[in-house]
Amino acid sequence: GRGMKMKMEKEEKMTTADPKATKETVELWNYLHAVAGKQIITGQHTQTIPCEEIAYIRQTTGKEPKLRGFELLGYSPNINYADASPECLTEIEENKGTAEMALQWAIEQRKNGNGGILTFTFHWFSPLGGRDKSFYTEHTDFDAREVLKEGTPERAAFYHDMDVIAEILRRFQEERIPILWRPFHESYGTWFWWGAQGPEVARNLYHLMFDYYTCLLYTSPSPRD
């Protein structure tokens, strides 16, 4: 009927939110859109650098997941090592170098024509510090609502950390490797600082990051330029 036709036309017009998305990003988006509701993409998050989960799957099935996930928590600029539990320190240590490993894996997948898909999760330690695993609400006094206000320490710290992570992600952009970027995960709950103040605040944090990461910023070395 007419309603189904309109729905199909709407689906056909779906595209990336960033009109300047790279060719590789658009190709990944089109692939995900094409398999949606028809196929299942198997994936596995890697908990540590050795990627023992992948080795187990390979040994058991003779195959590897098409999608592989990595964690960026070790790149948080404000980890309080002096007040971190042994568990926290172990988790940080086990995730050091994940970006480099992910980049190497993605390049190899492209070289071999395997079409691997890369996704990143970021357990973001509080931009203003805290105790132990300060991405947990109970371990930080960081108020995400303050990020949405101009001129606050929270906002400055938020943007500082985004700059740090942007430099990591830039390596993948230079290699033209798209990423399924997963910041502010589980924001429907209150256990992480980015979700502690409710879904609207979490949504606005995402919008800030999206705008900041997709807008082209130009700086000149000379006032005359």
Question: What spans do the regions from the language model cover?
Answer:
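Catalytic domains of carbohydrate-active enzymes, especially glycoside hydrolases
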Residues: 53-77, 113-117
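Conserved small/polar residues in nucleotide/adenosyl-binding loops
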Residues: 218-225
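Active-site neighborhood of glycoside hydrolase catalytic domains
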Residues: 204-213
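Alpha-helical scaffolding within the catalytic cores
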Residues: 50-57, 100, 164-168, 224
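Sec-exported extracytoplasmic/periplasmic mature domains
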Residues: 73, 174, 214-215
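Substrate-binding cleft of extracellular glycoside hydrolase catalytic domains
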Residues: 88-177, 183, 187-205
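Structural recognition of the beta-strand scaffold that forms the well-ordered cores
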Residues: 41-43, 66-71, 117-121, 179-183
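N-terminal module-boundary/linker segments of secreted carbohydrate-active enzymes
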Residues: 7-66
